UniProtKB/Swiss-Prot annotation:
GO terms for cellular component: cytoplasm. This is Uridine kinase. Pathway: Pyrimidine metabolism; CTP biosynthesis via salvage pathway; CTP from cytidine: step 1/3; Pyrimidine metabolism; UMP biosynthesis via salvage pathway; UMP from uridine: step 1/1. NCBIfam families: PRK05480.1, udk. One of its GO terms (biological process) is UMP salvage. Its EC number is 2.7.1.48. It holds the Pfam family PRK.
Length: 211
């Protein structure tokens, strides 16, 4: 008898909306029964380009991501196969030579700004979530994160936000909200939403006999 199909949760939302915080909190709540696949680590490998060219890439456009590899890895997890997730170096703007093993699990969380964008990914999901947050709050969080954690300049972060992040959010990310089954305000600061999502996953696990 084959194992039941994993319960797949897609968590999307704008940059610094709290989607990663929510996904990680949900993964901690469910423990070893979760495989978490963050899309942030699936930026295309641009190590062959000089740093100056890598700095000019629009990392908020769908073309910046290796969506084919992300889909391949998501499908592998659903078939019960482990994957070697790439590791992205945000300071070097390219992939690290390291890989992170991700084991299959009864719950698979797909998380990232564009996980609701490709229909092929949406079709894998049992529950689609969009994390909503005020644009000003998202900008401030991103500013702090990129300057303090990723070593970027204040001027560079502001320019990138105005020229790339904001227009790409309006064009590609925000429209995917219409595909969501659940819209979560306040992202990682919303314990009620976390409890609701965890309860939904636990109920499915119980029906699968994996609780």
């Amino acid at each position: 008898m084959s194992a039941p199909k994993p319960f797949v949760i897609g968590i999307a939302g704008g940059t610094a909306s709290g989607k990663t915080t929510l996904a990680q909190a949900l993964a901690r709540t469910l423990g070893e029964r979760v495989a978490l696949l963050p899309m942030d680590h699936y930026y295309k490998d641009l190590g062959h380009l000089p740093l100056e060219e890598r700095l000019r890439v629009n990392y908020d456009h769908p073309d910046a991501f290796d969506l084919a590899l992300y889909l391949e890895h998501a499908q592998a997890l659903l078939r019960g196969l482990p994957v070697e997730m790439p590791v992205y170096d945000f300071r070097a703007y390219t992939r690290s030579p390291r890989r992170t093993p991700v084991r299959p699990a009864p719950v698979v969380i797909l998380e990232g700004i564009l996980v609701l964008y490709p229909k092929e990914l949406r079709d894998l999901m049992d529950l689609k979530v969009f994390v909503d947050a005020d644009a000003d709050e998202r900008f401030i969080r991103r500013l702090k994160r990129d300057v303090l954690e990723r070593g970027r300049s204040l001027e560079g972060v502001v320019a990138q936000y105005l020229e790339q992040v904001k227009p790409m959010h309006l064009h590609f990310v925000e429209p995917t909200k219409r595909y969501a089954d659940v819209i979560v305000p306040r992202g990682g600061q919303n314990p009620v939403a976390l409890e609701m999502l965890a309860a939904k996953a636990l109920a499915r696990l119980a029906r699968m006999g994996a609780a």
